[in-house]
Every structure is written in structure tokens, then in C-alpha cells.
Amino acid sequence: MAPKKKPQKQSNKAASSSSSSKSNYQKPSSGPKLQISAENEDRLRRLLLNSGRSGPSIPAPISNSLSKAQKTKKLNNVYEKLSCEGFVDDQIELALSSLRDGATFEAALDWLCLNLPSHELPVKFSTGASRFPSTGGSVGVISTSRDDWNDSTDSSVRVEEEEPAVFVRVKGKQDEEDTLSSDKSSQADWIRQYMMRQEEEELECWEDEVDGIDPRNKVSGPRPFDVIAKEYYSARSDAIKAKEKRDKRGQEQAGLAIRKLKQEISDLGLSEAMLESEFQREHAFESATEQESTCPISDNLHESVDADDVSVQMLDNLTLNTNPAESYESEEIQTKALPSSSSGQDFVASDEDSEDVELGDTFFEEIPPSEISPHELLELQKEEKMRELRSEKNLGKLDGIWKKGEAQKIPKAFLHQLCQRSGWEAPKFNKETGEGRNFSYTVSILRKASGRGKNRQAGGLVTLQLPPKDENFESIEDAQNKVAAFALHKLFSDLPVHFAITEPYASLVLIWKQEELLCTTIQSTEEDRRANFVDKLLEEDSFSLTTSSSSFENSLPLVDSYVKDKDDLGVVKSNNRAKRDSYIEAECLSLQRKQENKKRTQKYKDMLKTRTALPISEVKNGILQHLKEKDVLVVCGETGSGKTTQVPQFILDDMIDSGHGGYCNIICTQPRRIAAISVAQRVADERCESSPGLDDSLVGYQVRLESARSDKTRLLFCTTGILLRKLAGDRTLNDVTHIIVDEVHERSLLGDFLLIILKSLIEKQSCDNTSRKLKVILMSATVDADLFSRYFGHCPVITAQGRTHPVTTHFLEEIYESINYLLAPDSPAALRSDTSIKDKLGSVNDRRGKKNLVLAGWGDDYLLSEDCLNPFYVSSNYNSYSDQTQQNLKRLNEDRIDYELLEELICHIDDTCEEGAILIFLPGVAEIYMLLDMLAASYRFRGPAADWLLPLHSSIASSEQRKVFLRPPKGLRKVIAATNIAETSITIDDVVYVIDSGKHKENRYNPQKKLSSMVEDWISQANARQRTGRAGRVKPGICFSLYTRYRFEKLMRPYQVPEMLRMPLVELCLQIKLLGLGHIKPFLSRALEPPSEGAMTSAISLLHEVGAVEGDEELTPLGHHLAKLPVDVLIGKMLLYGGIFGCLSPILSIAAFLSYKSPFIYPKDEKQNVDRVKLALLSDNGVSSSDLNNNDRQSDHLLMMVAYDKWVKILQERGMKAAQRFCESKFLSSSVMRMIRDMRVQFGTLLADIGLINLPKTGEFSGRKKENLDVWFSDPTQPFNMYSQQPEVVKAILCAGLYPNIAANDKGITETTFNSLTKQGNQTKSYSAWYDGRREVHIHPSSINSNFKAFQNPFLVFLEKVETNKVYLRDTTIVSPFSILLFGGSINVHHQSGSVTIDGWLKVAAPAQTAVLFKELRLTLHSILKDLIRKPEKSGIVHNEVVKSMVHLLIEEGKPQHK
């Protein structure tokens, strides 16, 4: 069997020629070289092959709609391509058998590269080095043996012998011809094996003859041509002799034998002329032998014996009974047998016997009869074609060009003649430059187009060159003639040019023609085997399908049995249902009796009297009546109406009183955890029951990481996310009777999402006409009731009046007047004339706040103004106020919070106002702690008063949140600093005074970061009224608004923009897929106010980039886990991988900084000092986690991690004041550090919530114990921190989280991308230029990498882009190619060239075997995540052998590469 082709190694000459032709062209390198030690590679391969995966993922099978012919064509195509790449049949068939009819060329290459040992692969796949570098338009025509040829019967057999080759380069043609050329690369090997088998058969036949066995009687069927020719010669000879003797009987017998032999040769598809030609040749040969004892080889051969100069006459003799490629071997044998010092006669006399052995035995001895194979038949046909080619009958094609008898011409002259005759330009011979190429030439010919229609031949410049093996020229003339002969062969293949040109060039032309004819033989033999294999493979698949179908039919009795068993099971279930209904009925009676007994108690009567006084009680009957008639109801109650606590109780009491209490299951959603907990506790108190969740209480609550419910719970308060999680397990909510959605006016993302689901459920149950129906109640204080009513099919709306005490509102200008406040010119809240434009833009200074950074990016005009005037100041509005107040308003920067004013105002309230708690609304946690720190440091709030300075936000523990509802001792004032969490749902009874900053933080998508982040912004008028209402819940109150009346009336929005219209939809899309709600866009288009098409497309695209979904929006294992983490998907991915790869603590810190902001502050004119401090932090190896070498300094994110670790160590060892001094000395923000600690705990508990890590089993981490939980997450002995001190691992996980925020220099991008990039100038740069795939970008001056000129790797990940006069990358980290391949975008392995592209523009040079290894590692990681879904409690995943090997790879191989 013929081996498959493998490109031949190119010699140094060709390499130098190829390189020299483009020596002046500068382009990117082949990419950073990815090299793995043999030990690592072998270990990883063994692990992967033993991990339960047999190889690369098998693609989806071909559609069953394809016919067998189409499947056959596809598999044949793959087979052919693999063959051309140098794989042997056994290897190809093994791969295709594994991949079945779903095989693709790429999948088969992956399988082979992963499963075959390196030494069995074609060299270019095991080393990644292409043997023929691409030259942009070359065609290689190769006739050579493969170095590692595998016989189909024994893959261990190798034939290691180089053969001569011919190489053609035709400029302007496509590289696709390279594949065709490689088909010829191993023909000589095949021929050699074939000849060896022929010799064995000859020996057998010789033995048979010795034993007296007639070979003609031994076998039946077609016989070889040579046997027939021999008999034909014998019959003709007999006929001649009989004619001479006038023996008529002998003539008749000979004639009959001749006719039979002619019929036999005709049956073989050969012409009778071949027999006659053979007879004439043998007859002439015999006559010549009788006349003189000389060799049949022409004397011309002996005059010039050279491997390249073989005469036509010699070719006639040598190629008669063999294929062309064998002639190379014959030449070598013949040359060795000819001593250069002897004449031809001497040679014949001395080596005749040797020649008989070496040549005669192989080519001239008779071949005994045997069965003719299709290959042998084709071989004979090729011999006939070669005879025809050498026949003088072809001379007619040269009419008008050359006649027999005319002097032969040198190839140069004849080529010139033919070009002139064709109307082409004269050939031009170009000397090739390079070492060792003194006589190397190419020939270029400019051809004109000719012909029309289908026969039209395109013109153009064609350049041809001989391969290196033919470049041993005697002279310039010889070099030019050889390449001219080659041009004659290629360009005038229809003409017998060998007749018209001189030797040795005529023989070379014949050799080249023989090589072309040989391809058909090899291809035909291969096609037979391939066709049989593909047919068998498809038949097996068909049989498998038939068997499956048969098995299914045979299993019908089992199915019937199963149905019968199921029917029996149904009877059991029916009995169980009857018992359950009986139990519920008893429960209904029990609840009814308890309710009646409770109503008789005085405590309940007093509480009921208080409840009845609430305004919502006036519409109680209307609410209950509407719920009996309709499935959806909107309840609109103003602040203080009591709707949140009373409506759920109305429904519960009504069902209990009507005897249906046992069936009642009410779920009331709240937008925040604190609201769910506090409302549940209040309702339990009003019902005179025990605390929520106890057995004698019907009320319970459930929030993330905290639950208080039991089997007796009939009214559950929970967050929206908890209900959505319940929907994931029970999409019909069959056991729920009522769902109450409170505070729908907030239009939160999850709230609107829940409404879509509820609407679908209501519509479905209306169609099903079920007896038990779900009831939905929407409640809000301020709401566009008609909007919700229309959305739910014009459902009824009930409005209840509010009951609040009067509240007096003082705006900013009035506060200035009342406390006689002076805004200092150097106050942070004041605009200053000495503020530079750079400072106003705030491109670096994070102290100006996140909102200001965003505004700076938007280019607010007022920040660029050189005067000190507040752009929102309208002088006519303040004519009645003092000059001091007007000056304050003129220089006020309204985007900054004036903490000095806040402190003075709080002191003013404490001094002049009656008792009552103060509630201060601030935008975020950092602002809360900044204010509380200022107050705690003041004389007024020292001692016991400091205990009543209380924060209130979603991040603090529930026990700490509950303290805000307690009353302080007499003489002490409670001061609560809160986020907008206190706007709705919760009521703090003793709050009388409200200070409203007018700010809050919204979650917005930052397109530069490709992250969602909290952005500070102004609240709406509706929010402002809600905050004001908090002051009048128990008695008349006062609201101090820290914004002007003009802003409230003219600049604030009436309502908040729904989150679905302003937030990224990525997390929402994940929930849609997790709940199995169909395709994303159709589902979201049913929203109350659908998001834009662009927003949905962007979200889906990001999910694909992150790897959360694939294909037709199919949720991946990674996406399944991300859907359970209520964080940005990039942060979630980083957290997941941080836990899996054992470096959680540093990743918690980095994720927190990415979600919040950098801890570094930049005082004016202190940038150099800050940079120096940064380097000092990285250089100090005193902290274990900062054990970094010089190369690991190239990371802003590792710097943040080190800063936090140092801060928290000082905090634990020396206390808060020492930690504060550390921050001041290192230009760090203490408030940011505290926020990072809280976020670390929050992120860690999220991972514990999904089962990725384990939390301590003892103790509840609340209050001061939160610090202990952060210590737990930092514990290096925990499995999730096993590799937390390995910077290479941390940076790899960082890459996983930040990708696709990546940039590369010219060494890491593809040539196509590099040529299409927008670059800034062409001058030579002294710095390393970076690109983001579209344009040149620059590292921001605030990054630690901005001062480096050399980088360990050509890739970096970044947090965000900032565009001014240039595009800057903020917060960068240099990452290794290993990280990109493991955690980057989609990878495309270029097996042949030994390179990998990532997302189509990044590149890495890697051998095919190594690249496929990384591809498989990705799939294995995919499987690990999938396994984690099935076993979420499997927290020891970091001990997985594949994960450990990947970590080892990152640590050992990811070190700096010296280039």
C-alpha cells in the first residue's frame, strides 16, 4: 500500500532563497514561542488520555438529512486531506473510526496530534516547523520518499532513504497546489516495496517451475503483461519458423495462440500494438545479441556517465518493466557500478555479471504468472503511455517547429523559439542570490492570454525554478539550460519537446513526465482502500442506528411493563395524595381554631385596633373581592398607608377564616434583604406570634445566606432573587397561592424580569383553566398604576391614601442661611481657580470620586471652565439670600459631598432640635464610613455616643442591621448613615430628621471596562419624596436637602430610569438561560419596557466571549455557575477559577478592586512619590503573598493585592490607627481598604453559597467576627489558597477574568491584523507599541508598567480604556501565552504551520501537538465545571490531577522567555 505524502525537508539553499527574496520586508514574527518541557507534555497527555476523554471533542455528527453519497464524499475528503498531510492509512482510519461520520479535518488532526506519539507524527506536527516556508505563491511538486513511512501492515517498519526531488515555484499561484504536490512525495517508497513483493513472487514461481509445476495452471484469472508478451513472442517466433518450414499445422496452432493472446491483452484494456511493439523490441534485442557481445545500452551512455544525464535509450530499457520512480534507484545502482576511469568496453567486460544481478534480475527476468491487481493493470497502462510518448509518431506535433533529422537545439534556444511562436515575450533568466547559489537561475516568461470561453487560458508572468537537488550545475550555461528544459516541460506539456532538445536535458524531460503519470497509479490504489474503509464505516453507523431502533422496538414490552408499573405507582400516589389532602384539611381546621382563639386575647385586640387605623384597611374588602374575581391586582399606597405589612395579612387571615388556611402559601418579595427581615419580624409581632421561622409562627423570611422558615410557614418574605431561584426548581409554582411583589416602582432589573415570568404563568393558567390559580399582587408607594395595569391585561387598580405627619423641607440655600455656613475656597466641595484642566478632568485622581471620573470621560464643559462659577448657579433665584450664601452657591461643586457641612448640620440638629433619630442618605458605603469616622473623631460623639453612630447598607450583617431599629438611652441621639436601602420598605420609628445628600449609586455598564460598575448620580424627584417621607412616620419631621430647590424642581428626573434600560443585561440573560425560558431576545421583548436591540445583542455577544454560552445560546457549565453568582460575569468567572485553581484570597482582593476602584490616591504634584511607593511595595518581600520577582512587578493588579495584604496584616497585628498611618504613608485610601475587606467577605460567601468552597462550621460571622471571616479566606492552609503565593497562577486567573480586555505588541498579533491596524506615525519608537486589535493603544501613566521599556511577554490585560488625545489602558498586567491559550478567546490551531490564533488576531507559535494539548485542557476544564454542577459539594476540586498539572504548567513553564 502506498504511504501517504509528507513534504520533503527543504535544503539550506532553498531556505536561503526563500528568505532572501523577502529580506527587505519587515513583518511581525511568527509569534511568541510556546515551549513545554517533554516531561510536562508527556504528563499532561497521559492525564488527559486517562481522564475518561478519548481525545478532542467529537463534533456533532453529520445531519441525517445527508445522503450516503454526501457522507461518503465528506469522509473521503477528510481522508484525502489527512493523507496529503503525511499520515498513513492506519493512523487516518483509526482517527476516523473514533470520530465516526461526524469527523472533520480539524477534529481528525486534533485527535491524531493528541493520541499519536510524537515520533509517529509527520515532523511538522510534532515540531511545528513547516518544511517549506510559505513564499506567498509557491507550488511544490515533490517526488520523494517519506522519512517515516509506515507500512499498512506494520507501523513499526520505516524506510529511511532520501530520493531526488523536483521543485517548481510558480509566482502568482495559490498555495493550494502545495497539497497536490505533496501527493507525489512517497511514490518511490511504494514502488520499492512493490518491487520487493514482486521479487518474492518471482522466487515462488521459480521454485514452482523447478518442482515441475506449470505456472499457467497454478492460478486462474488475468495474467501480467510480460507473461502474455513472452508467450506472444514465442507464438510469433513459432509462426515465423513454421512459415519458413511451410508447416501449415504449426502455422494454424501459432495463429490460434496469437489470436487468444490478443484477446487476452484486449480484455486487460491494452492495445494489440503493445504486443507487436514488444515483439519488435525483443526481436531486435535478440538479433543484436547474436551479432555482437555488447551491452544493449548505447555507447553514448558510457561517454558521459552522470546521475543527471541518462540517455533516452537507457530509459527505454530501464522503464520497460518498471515504474518511473524506480529509475532513480536504478541510476544510483548503475552509477556505482561504473568506474570513472574505465571506458565503456572495459566496463561491459568487467561488470556484466554484476549488471545482470543488479539490473537484469529486477527488470528483465520473466515474471511468473499471477493474479493482476488493479494497480498492476494501471501500471501497464502507464508503460504503454510512455512508449507512445517516445514513439516517433508524436513528431507530427512538432510540424513547423522541428523535423526529424534536423539538429537538436539546446533548451534555451528551443524555449525562445516556442515563446516567440506563441506570441509571448522572450524568456528572461534571473540569477538567484544566496550562499552556495553561484549557478542557480530562474526563468520568467510573460504570457499573453489565449483562447475563448472554457478554453481560455489566462496570461501573466510565470517564474519557474528547479529544486535544490538539481542545482549542481557545471556552468552558467548548464544552469540556464536545465531551467529552460523544465520550463519547456511545464509550459508546453502537449509537445514532445524531448525530441528537439539535446541530451542530457531530453532525458530529464522524460523523467518529469513519468513522475506525473505515476500519480494516477498511486491515487487509484489509495482510492480503493479509502472507498472500502468509508463504506464500511458508514455501514457500521447505519447498523448501529438500526440496532438502536431494533432495541427500541424490542424494549416495547418493557415499556408496556413500565407503563403498567407506572399505573400501579399512580395508584400509590393517588393514595398518598388523598392522605395529604386529609392532612391539609385537618391543618385548615386547626388554623381556623387557633385564629378564633387568638382573636379573643386582649393583646391581639389591641394590635388589631392599631392595624385597623391604617389607611390601607379602608380598601381591605375591595382587595379581597378583586382577588376572588381576578388573577392580578395592583395596589397603590402612599407612604405610611401600611400596604407592605397589612395586605399579606389580609390575604392570610381571609384564607384561614374561610377554612383554606392549610392550602395558603403566600410569598412576598422585597427588593432588599433588610426589608424582608424587618417586615417579617414586624408582621409576626402584629400577629402576636413567635419570631419568624419558629413552629408556632406562620411568618418566615429567606434571604441569601440566612433563612427563618419552617413547615408551618404560610407567609414568606424573601428577596426577588430567592423567588427566582425557586422558579428554577419549580417553574409552575404549583404549591404557591399568592405572590406579592412589593416596591415595583423601583423598576429593578430582577423585578421587571420577575414580572415577565409572572405574566407568562398567568397567561398559561388562563389557557389551562385550572381550578387552583396563582394570584399576583403588585404593590408600590409611587407608581404609574396604569402602566402595570395595561401590562397585565388592564387588571384592576386599588389606591390607598398615605398617612404621614407633615415634613418641613429645607433646601441647601436655606441650610446655608440657618447655620451661617461659609464654604471655604480650599474646601474639596469648592471650585478653585488654581485647579488645572488636568485636575478637573481627573484622568488619574481617583479622590474625585467614581462619578467625576465618568463625567470627565464624558467631557463635562463646566469642568473645563477656567472661571469659578458653578454652572448650575442662577443668580436671580437667590436675590433674597445673604452675600455669603450666594458666594457659597457660586463656588460650589455640586458633584462633591461637603462633609464639613454635614458635620456642622448634624451638630446644629443635635443642639437645637428635639429628640429623635437622624437619618442621613449617602450614595455609598465609602461615603458612609468617611462621615462616621469624622463624627467619631469629634468631641461631641465620643464615648457612649459613638455606639449610636450606625451604618445601614446591604453589606453589613443582619444582626448589625437590626440595631438601627432600637432606641438609644435617654440623652443620646441615634445617627444613622444609610444608602438608599432605607428609602422604602423599612420604617425606623424614631427617625424625625432626615439629611438627604441627593445622591445614590446606580449600577451602569461601562463600555470601556466592559464591566458593570456602581456610578454616583443624582436621585429622581420620586426618590427625593420617598426620603423626605421617612421623617414623618411617627411625628412631624424635618428634611434637610443638600441640593438647591432649583435642582429639585428643574434638573432632577421625575422618575428613575428602569434598570433594564440602563444596566447591562448579561446577568439577566444568564438567568433566562438558567430557568430555561427560551431564546433571550424574544423573552426580553415581552418586558414592561423592553431594552434596546443593541443592548441585548451586546449582552449575548459578551456571554459568548466569556464562554458562558455557546452555539445557539446553549448554557455552558461555566455559564451555569455564573448564573448563580449575582456579580458581573467577568468578576464571577475570575472568582470561580480562583477557587478551582487554589488562589482564592488574592483573587478576592483583585476582584473587589476591579468592582470598586483603585486604592491609590494622587495628591497634587505627588505622582513621582506615588510611583516610588508602588515599586517599594512590590520590592518588599516581607509579606508572603508578595514574594515576587522582577518580572512579576509588571502588574498593577498584583500591586493592589500586595497593598491589601500588607494593610490587613498591620490591621490585625497593630490595630486600626497603625493601619491608617500605613495608608497615609503609602498614598492609600483607608475607606477603600475597608470596603475591599467587606467585598472580599461578600464574594467569598457567594462562592460558599454555590458550594465551591466551605465556610467554618462553628460560629456565625457577624459584627466584629466579619474580620475573622476575612482571615479565614486569607488562610494559606485552606485548599482554596493552595497556590495563592504563586504569581503566575494569579495572573492566569486574572487573564480569565479580564479577557477580552487584552492588548498585544507586534510579536503577539497576526500579520493580517498588524497590516490593518491604525498606527500612530511610522517613525522608529523607543517604546514598545501596543495594539487592541483595531488601533494602537498606550499604557496609562498611572500604571506601574508605563515606565517599563521591555516586557517579559507580548500580552497584557487591562481594566479599562480611557480616551483623550490617545487611547490609554488603565491598570494593566503582563500575562504569558500560557494564560491566553488556557483562558483566552476561541483558539484556532494551524496544525501545518505550527501556530495558534486566538480570536482571529492574537497569535502564538506552538507545535501542533502542544496546541492541541491546550485545546484539550480547555475541554477538560469544561468537564470539571460540568462535574461541579452535578456535585456542588465537591469542594476538593483543586486536588484534581488535571488541575494540579495545569497549575504546575503555569508555574514551571510560564516563567519569562528570553528572546
Swiss-Prot record:
The keyword Protein biosynthesis does not apply. Gene3D superfamilies: 1.20.120.1080, 3.30.160.20, P-loop containing nucleotide triphosphate hydrolases. One of its GO terms (molecular function) is ATP hydrolysis activity. Keywords: ATP-binding, Chloroplast, Helicase, Hydrolase, Nucleotide-binding, Plastid, RNA-binding, Transit peptide. PROSITE patterns: HELICASE_ATP_BIND_1, HELICASE_CTER. Residues 901-1076 form the Helicase C-terminal domain. It comes from the Eukaryota. It is found in: Plastid, Chloroplast. It catalyses: ATP + H2O = ADP + phosphate + H(+). ATP binds at residues 637-644. Residues 1-37 form a transit peptide. A motif (DEIH box) lies at residues 742-745. Its EC number is 3.6.4.13. Residues 1-42, 324-352 are annotated as: Disordered. It is an enzyme of class 3 (hydrolase). Residues 9-30 have a biased composition (Low complexity). Residues 624-801 form the Helicase ATP-binding domain. One of its GO terms (cellular component) is chloroplast. Belongs to the DExH box helicase family. This is DExH-box ATP-dependent RNA helicase DExH7, chloroplastic. The lineage of its organism: Eukaryota, Viridiplantae, Streptophyta, Embryophyta, Tracheophyta.
